[in-house]
Amino acid sequence: MAKYEIIPLVLGSLETDKSMMMMFMECGTKINIPIVSFYIKGAKKNILVDTGCPADVMMKYWPAPASDTQSFEEALEKLGLKPGDIDIVIHTHLHFDHCGNTSKCTNAKVVVQEDELKFALSPHPVYTMLYIRNMLERLNFYPVKGDTEIVEGVKVLHTPGHTPGAQSVAIDTAKGTAIITGFCCIRETFEVPDEARQLFPYWLVYTPGINTNSLEAFDSALKVKGLADILIPLHDLELGKVKKIP
C-alpha cells in the first residue's frame, strides 16, 4: 500500500478572531491563520488539497488584513511543478480562501462533495460573502457523495458542519493515517483544557466557530480527532514551521 508525505505550502496569512476557530471562546483575540495548500507527495498523480488565495483577493471579500508569503506559482516551483501539472485538486470546501488559485490548475480534476457544490452555487444569504461564483466557473468539478477513495491510500471523509459539504482528507503515511480537517480550525480546537471540561464535561473538542450547523461541526471535529493518527488542523498556526508530515 502506498505511503505518502504531506507538504504544507503556506502561501500567506489572514487575520481573524480566535472565536472563528473555537465557537464562543476567546472572542476579541486576534490571530493570523495560515493560508495553505497541501501537496501529497508520493502519489502517481500530482494531488493538492486546497489551493489557498492571494491576499489582495481575500481582502476584497473579507474585511480583515491579509498578507502573502509566496505566490501559488512560487510554492509549486519549489516542488518542480507548475499549476498545469496538477492532476487532482481535492477541496475541503469552497470558501474563497481555499479555492482562490484553483482556476490556474487548468488540467486538474476538482474533487468536491455534491452537497458543497450545490450550496456554493446557491448559498444561503448569510454565507454569500464566502462563496465567490467567478472562482468556481469553468472548473472541472468531480462531485462525490460521502466517504470516497480518490486514489489508493487517499480518501475523503464527509465531515459537515463548517459547511454542508465539508470533507476531510485521510492520507496513509508511514506513521499512520494523517487527516487534513475539512473545516477551519486550529490545534486548540481539539485541546479542551481541564478547567473548561469542568464547566462543560461533554466538550471533548471545541465547535469550529464558522458553521452552518454547530451540532454537525462538533460531531465532525470529534470524528476526525478519533480517526486520525496524525491530525492536521486546516489552519494550524504551526504549519509555517513544518516542511513535511510526517
Located regions from the model:
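Short, solvent-exposed loop/turn segments at secondary-structure boundaries
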Residues: K60-P63, P123-H124, K243
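Beta-strand-turn-beta hairpins that frame and shape the catalytic cleft
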Residues: M1-I6, K41-N46, T148-V156, T173-T177
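Cap/insert and terminal regions of metallo-dependent hydrolase folds
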Residues: T69, E74, K175-P246
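Active-site metal-binding loops of divalent metal-dependent hydrolases
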Residues: T51-C53, L94, E116, H162-T163, ...
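Metallo-beta-lactamase
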Residues: S67-Q70, E74-D97, K109-H158, T163, ...
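Conserved beta-strand hairpin/beta-sheet module of binuclear metal-dependent hydrolase folds
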Residues: L11-E74, S168-G182, I186
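Short, conserved loop/helix-junction motifs that constitute active-site signature segments
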Residues: T102-T106
